[in-house]
Every structure is written in C-alpha cells, then in structure tokens.
C-alpha cells in the first residue's frame, strides 16, 4: 500500500473506531491527518502524537491526501467526501482500512453483540503478558496502555469486529471469536434475525482453511450457527459441554474467582485457578474467550493468570470513580459511582447483576440515558423489565444520535411504563445537564450509583464532584 498511498486522512478521526486505526498507521510511518466536528481528549492525544487534526470539516483538509477514511457516521454530503470524490481521491470505509492493516499481521477478530471491547482488551492483554507483543485496535480505551490502539512488534493483530453495519464481513482474520448474537442494529439486517445469524456464519467463512473459531457455548444463537461453521471450533462458557469451561465461580467484591477446565486437541490441559479483576458472570465468559485464544497460541498458564488478575479494565466498562459525599440534607455520608457504556437491555442486566454480586447489601441506583429512539422502541419492554430490577432509577431523555424522535419511544414513555409496572418509582430528568444536581439531591449514604448509556451521560461522573 505504501508505494502509492503515503498521506491518509480520517474524516471523524475522534471516533472510537477511527482513532485507533489512525494511530497505528501513524506509527507505521504514514502521514496521517484527520478532522472532527469538535475537539476532545482523543483529538488532543492524536495531535500530541503528531497527527494533524482539523476541527470542522472543509474541502481543503483533504487537498494533499492520497486516501480518505470514513465511518458509517459520515454522510455522503460531507464536504471532505465530496472534495475527495471530485479529485478522484479514494474514499475508503473504516472496515476496509482495518482489513488492510490486518493483512500485515495474523488477525484475531472479536465479534458479537455484547462484550466485544472487553474481550478484545482481555485477549490483547493476555497475549502481551505471554510475550507475543500484539498490535491491537479496540473500540474503547485499554487502561493499561492508555490508548485504544497500539502497534506491537509481534505477528498478531487483535481487533474488534463491528457487526452493527455488517462491516465485519470485510475482515479476513485467522481466528474469529463470537461472544454472543442478539437483536441489535436490526435496521442493518432488515429486522430479520435469520439474516443477522447468516452474517455471523459468513464472518466465520472468511477464515482461511487453517483458521479457527472460538464460540460461546452459553449463547443460544451462537449454538444455533455452530453446525454451519466449517472451520475448527473451540467452545467456551459455563455450559457443561464447553471445551474451555469455568467452574466454582465466586464473586469476591469486584473480582471473580473460578477454575478453568480446558479440553486440548490431543489431551486435556492443566486446570487453571483464575482470579479476574472484573466483576460479573459476563466478564467470566469474556475472560474464557481470552483463555481459549491464549491456550491455542501456547501462552504460558502463569502469564494467562497474571494478565487476568492484573487487568486494569477498559474505559467506561464498569469504571469505578470512587466515593462522593452525600448532601447534608440527605444525612451525609458517602456513595460510590460506577460509569458504564451499556445501552442494550442485555448489557444493562449483566452490569446490574455484577453490581449486586459485588455489593449485595447496598442500594443500587441506576441513572440511565437511553441511546437512540429506534433501540428504545425495539427493546422497550426489555428496558422496562431491566430498569425495574434496580432499587432506584433516574431516567433522562433519549440521546438521539442523529435520529428523529419517535412517538412513545422517548424517556418520558419509559418512565411512565416503569411507573405502571410498579417495581420502582423513576425520577425523570429531562435534560442530562441537570443530572449531576439531581444525583446529589437523591443519593444516600452507602448507595452505589451506576451511570449508564452510550451518549452524553459519559460526562456526568467528572461533574459530580462540583458543588458537592
């Protein structure tokens, strides 16, 4: 690629899926520039690394580029896209550029509706602990690396494969992990679950004849596609027939302890005694996927256990912000704050269950900002059911993510339905900007607050200390 393409420009470079690819290309020696609508910690970090970042989109930003990279969030009438097409500069989808990066290494791609970012991070961390020095491109910030991407000197590249727009079908990994298959982003698949499953089958068919698939045996939809996977399979989970299986699972605060039995191709491998620095059964499954990959690649058992015990987490995945003071009007004291990206009912249920396991005797308060009107509509009853499992709920208006409002699929409708269900009396806070003060007025000593959503609620944790 480099003999013809030297300067690559990213439209929307601050996006989680874009910034990592840009950083790796910069470290490979390419000239990389990018633009975004607003400045952020991501764009500032990229600028510090030497990437030229423009705030705002303008035709002149692409004047010297040999190729421009776009994500599905970038519209066709973007001035940089128009200018590139007029100048016959190639306009490359993000997933296609990621596929080009993967051609330089042996690719390990993590797909699935939930758990991709954490699983990708765990795989990268375990391989790094085993001395394999992988390159990785992740959809979230790996805390131990301080970044969501890193260029390693080893032969493997570990990437997060995005099914939301079916772009994961551009990738050509040698190992494919599927964590689960659930109904989300169904506009892409014509609201047809069969088409969604077919896409995951096709994803495994992109593997070479010497490739392999690592599949979660606990997920019913993943089990359904197994007969159609034509490559060697390693299954993982808590199911009795999983080849990499967790037993004796116990919560220890925000850590999990469990034993792992592993069926080898010729003989069983030694049982591992694992301490995972993450809470919840869903994270036990994510760790099992990483263990399956590492065992296949010959990573030493001690390195696997060390990486999992010392895992420092991923940004906005059950991120603990510490304790904050309770207002004197509420009796004083302290409450704990957790920040989480979860925005689908399945993810929310897993996070709430993890919190219950970590703090069984404390009040769990959920502050939730729904993400997209279409998801709120499609998962409405499931949202009501999951929200009702919290001890108390603060609910904001939907974060639109560019969508037009839908009747009976907004935050008020969710609050009404939750009230009718009778399990919890929600506090509706229409403007998320008012949420920090609402939280201060609501919390009591010993409470655990979980701030959850994929939108602007991510800014709230840093605002809670103000005026406390």
From Swiss-Prot:
Source species, domain of life: Bacteria
Broad class of enzyme this protein falls into: ligase
GO MF, any single term: ATP binding
UniProt subcellular location: Cytoplasm
Pathway membership, UniProt: Cell wall biogenesis; peptidoglycan biosynthesis
A GO cellular component annotation in the UniProt record: cytoplasm
Binding locations of ATP: 112-118
Main location (coarse class): cytoplasm
The EC number(s) this enzyme carries: 6.3.2.8
Catalytic activity: UDP-N-acetyl-alpha-D-muramate + L-alanine + ATP = UDP-N-acetyl-alpha-D-muramoyl-L-alanine + ADP + phosphate + H(+)
GO biological process, one term: cell wall organization
Keywords: ATP-binding, Cell cycle, Cell division, Cell shape, Cell wall biogenesis/degradation, Cytoplasm, Ligase, Nucleotide-binding, Peptidoglycan synthesis
Family: Belongs to the MurCDEF family.
Purpose: Cell wall formation.
Name of this chain's protein: UDP-N-acetylmuramate--L-alanine ligase
């Amino acid at each position: 690629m480099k003999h013809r393409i030297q300067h690559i420009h990213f439209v929307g470079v601050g996006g989680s899926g874009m910034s990592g690819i840009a950083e790796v290309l910069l470290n490979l020696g390419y000239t990389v520039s990018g633009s975004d609508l607003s400045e952020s910690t991501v764009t500032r970090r990229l600028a510090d690394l030497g990437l030229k970042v423009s705030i705002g989109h303008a035709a002149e930003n692409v004047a010297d580029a040999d190729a421009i990279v776009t994500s599905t969030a970038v519209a066709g009438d973007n001035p940089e896209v128009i200018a590139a097409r007029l100048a016959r500069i190639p306009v490359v989808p993000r997933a296609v550029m990621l596929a080009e990066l993967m051609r330089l290494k042996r690719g390990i791609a993590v797909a699935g509706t939930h758990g991709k970012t954490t699983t990708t991070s765990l795989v990268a961390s375990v391989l790094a602990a085993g001395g394999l020095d992988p390159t990785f491109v992740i959809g979230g910030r790996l805390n131990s690396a301080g970044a969501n991407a890193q260029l390693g000197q080893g032969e493997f590249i570990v990437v997060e494969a995005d099914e939301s727009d079916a772009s994961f079908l551009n990738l050509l990994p040698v190992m494919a992990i599927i964590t689960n298959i659930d109904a989300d982003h169904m506009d892409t698949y014509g609201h047809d679950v069969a088409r969604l499953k077919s896409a995951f089958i096709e994803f495994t068919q992109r593997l070479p004849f010497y490739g392999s698939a690592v599949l979660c045996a606990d997920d019913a939809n993943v089990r359904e596609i197994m007969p159609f996977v034509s490559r060697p399979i390693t299954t993982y989970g808590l199911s009795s027939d999983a080849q990499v299986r967790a037993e004796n699972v116990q919560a220890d605060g925000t850590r999990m302890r469990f034993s792992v039995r592993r069926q080898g191709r010729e003989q069983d491998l030694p049982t591992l005694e694992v301490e995972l620095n993450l809470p919840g059964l869903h994270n036990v499954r994510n760790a099992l996927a990483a263990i399956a990959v590492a065992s296949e690649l010959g990573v030493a058992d001690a390195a696997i256990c060390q990486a999992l015990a010392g895992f420092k987490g991923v940004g906005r995945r059950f991120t603990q912000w510490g304790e904050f003071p309770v207002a004197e009007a509420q009796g004083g004291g302290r409450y704990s704050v957790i920040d989480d990206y979860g925005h689908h009912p399945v993810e929310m249920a897993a996070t709430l269950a993890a919190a219950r396991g970590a703090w069984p005797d404390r009040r769990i308060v959920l502050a939730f900002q729904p993400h997209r009107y279409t998801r709120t509509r499609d998962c409405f009853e499931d949202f009501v059911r999951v929200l009702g499992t919290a001890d108390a709920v603060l609910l904001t208006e939907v974060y639109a993510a560019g969508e037009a409002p839908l009747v009976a699929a907004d935050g008020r409708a969710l609050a009404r339905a939750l009230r009718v269900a009778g399990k919890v009396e929600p506090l509706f806070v229409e403007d998320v900007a008012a949420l920090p003060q609402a939280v201060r007025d609501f919390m009591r000593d010993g409470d655990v607050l979980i701030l959850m959503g994929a939108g602007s609620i991510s800014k709230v944790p840093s605002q809670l200390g103000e005026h406390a």
